[in-house]
């Protein structure tokens, strides 16, 4: 179905005219103006339904729909602007995987934890777990999707380890509580539904969680953990 066919009569009118007065003027004929000799009076009669050549639309209905349509358009523009991966020509599977998950992570529909192991600009081997949704909100991913910089773990991420200096850091994020004292290995508790994410490759990742190894030419080792919250809101 064409988009215009799905619009109501009010929607058609609202999208056609910038203001309610413009709509009223479109309903006034030259004959009306000739006899009434008052444009303001002619508008009032159209608004009351006594004059006019088409659909009767109340001022409050027009203005309410106009506001709703403007809000929807602004939200769409904001969403397109927010998705930094939109319109990018991505060749590496890792960047493609991040792009596929960007919108849902921003919207809170999905929570992705990124494990990366590789060498930093100093040649040191580092690894860590990144809260993708948190990073999306706290920094601009344009440089990563454009290939100008590589996404690497930081000491401010949920987990960071430098294999050369043996520096190890753990931090809870807005979305996850880090459980570092577990004898079987590192665990992350998702704060919204309190489900445990187990990143041990030999263990099941947990309820509503999926482990996805990624083949990439950009890093030595990449694994994504997708968690879908089932908490009722």
Curated annotation (Swiss-Prot):
It is found in: Cytoplasm; Nucleus. Keywords: Cytoplasm, Nucleus. Abundantly expressed in testis, specifically in spermatogonia and primary spermatocytes but not in secondary spermatocytes and spermatids. Its main location: cytoplasm. It comes from the Eukaryota. May be involved in spermatogenesis. GO terms for cellular component: cytoplasm; nucleus. It holds the Pfam family DUF4464. This is Cilia- and flagella-associated protein 299. Signal peptide: none annotated.
């Amino acid at each position: 179905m064409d988009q215009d066919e799905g619009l109501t009569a009010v929607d058609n009118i609202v999208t056609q005219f910038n203001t309610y007065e413009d709509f009223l003027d479109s309903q006034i004929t030259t004959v009306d103006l000739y006899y009434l000799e008052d444009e303001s009076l002619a508008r009032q009669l159209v608004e009351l339904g006594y004059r006019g050549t088409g659909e009767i639309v109340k001022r409050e209905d027009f203005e309410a729909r106009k506001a709703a349509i403007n809000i929807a358009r602004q939200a769409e523009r904001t969403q397109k602007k927010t998705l930094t991966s939109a319109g990018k020509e991505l060749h590496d599977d890792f960047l493609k995987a991040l792009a596929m998950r960007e919108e849902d992570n921003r919207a809170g529909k999905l929570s992705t934890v990124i494990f990366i192991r590789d060498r930093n600009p100093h040649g040191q081997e580092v690894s860590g777990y990144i809260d993708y949704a948190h990073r999306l909100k706290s920094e601009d991913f344009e440089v990563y999707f454009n290939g100008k910089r590589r996404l690497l773990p930081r000491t401010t991420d949920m987990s960071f380890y430098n294999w050369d200096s043996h520096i190890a850091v753990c931090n809870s994020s807005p979305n996850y509580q880090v459980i570092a004292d577990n004898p079987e290995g590192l665990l992350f508790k998702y704060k919204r539904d309190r489900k445990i994410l187990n990143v041990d490759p030999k263990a099941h990742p947990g309820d509503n969680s999926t482990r996805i190894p990624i083949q990439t030419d950009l890093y030595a080792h990449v694994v994504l953990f997708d968690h879908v919250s089932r908490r009722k809101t």
